[in-house]
A protein has these predicted regions:
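Extracytoplasmic gate region of multi-pass secondary transporters
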Residues: 53-108
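Helix-to-loop junctions at the C-terminal end of transmembrane segments
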Residues: 107-119, 203-204
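Juxtamembrane intracellular "pre-TM" segments in multi-pass secondary transporters
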Residues: 26-60
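Multi-pass alpha-helical transporter architecture, strongest
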Residues: 19-27, 216-236
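Intracellular juxtamembrane helix-capping segments at the cytosolic ends
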Residues: 160-173
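Helix-loop-helix hairpin linking two adjacent transmembrane segments in secondary transporters
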Residues: 1-31
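Structural signature of the two symmetry-related core transmembrane helices
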Residues: 122-137, 216
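A late C-terminal transmembrane helix in Major Facilitator Superfamily
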Residues: 172-208, 215
Length: 236
């Protein structure tokens, strides 16, 4: 038997590999962390880096919430839509989700590198704005190749600002980096579950095609919000 939930046991393999990589990198991670602690302590003693813009943080978290809602909604409702309304088989529909998520990994890496060269605002605004085009095209794709192309671009752009937003919020909260990480990676992304649930209710009420065709509005809204957020001078 080729498919089935019994194959989930093979996910142990990447977990073991990740454990080995982390164990190997742990000495270097500890060294970097100790350097940061010393540097942060010096800032606290000198009174530097204490200013926090709570309004900027709020809008950054709102941006992350919208981005995560779109990302989670697409890979949640994608297979349902293409199987029910486009007649795709289970394997093809599931492959679309894998392509969407894998291109997100590539987009995160590219976005982080470009952020160092172009600045965080251009990546945060530009990436999610560009994602609205393929996301809007996804529900209109009728052929598997067109759907794969659309979800590839959507997955690449929608999440490519992930690392950048984490760093920006950490810079906004220089003395609370742990909390900044929790707010960006935990709270805001976790709240996307509420957004997905809301869109699910709308899909049940008005139909999944209408919701998927309208979801491209959220990236545009997020891009507008991000364009108005003052960036910390340390990373401009």
């Amino acid at each position: 038997q080729e498919g089935g939930l019994h194959n989930c046991i093979y996910f142990i393999i990447p977990g073991i590999i990740a454990f080995g990589v982390l164990q190997y990198a742990m000495p270097e991670l500890k060294r970097v962390n100790n350097e940061y602690v010393k540097k942060n302590a010096a800032k606290e003693n000198s009174g530097a880096g204490m200013s926090i813009s709570y309004i900027s943080i709020f809008f950054m978290l709102l941006y992350i919430f919208l981005r995560s809602t779109v990302h989670s909604s697409v890979h949640t409702y994608l297979p349902i839509y293409f199987m029910k309304f486009r007649g795709f088989d289970t394997v093809t529909a599931s492959t679309l989700v894998s392509i969407f998520l894998l291109n997100g990994v590539l987009g995160t890496d590219c976005g982080a590198r470009l952020s160092d060269k172009l600045g965080p605002r251009k990546i945060i605004v530009g990436s999610i704005l560009l994602s609205s085009l393929p996301i809007g095209f996804v529900p209109h794709a009728t052929a598997p190749w067109a759907a794969m192309l659309a979800v590839s671009l959507a997955g690449f752009f929608i999440i490519s600002s992930f690392a950048t937003t984490v760093v920006v919020v950490q810079t906004m909260m220089p003395n609370n980096v742990g909390m900044a990480s929790g707010l960006t990676i935990g709270f805001s992304i976790g709240m996307a579950g509420f957004g997905v649930t809301t869109l699910g209710y709308l899909a049940d009420t008005y139909g999944l095609p209408i919701v998927l065709k309208s979801i491209c509005i959220l990236p545009i809204l997020a891009a507008f919000i991000a364009s108005r957020i003052p960036m910390p001078k340390e990373i401009k």
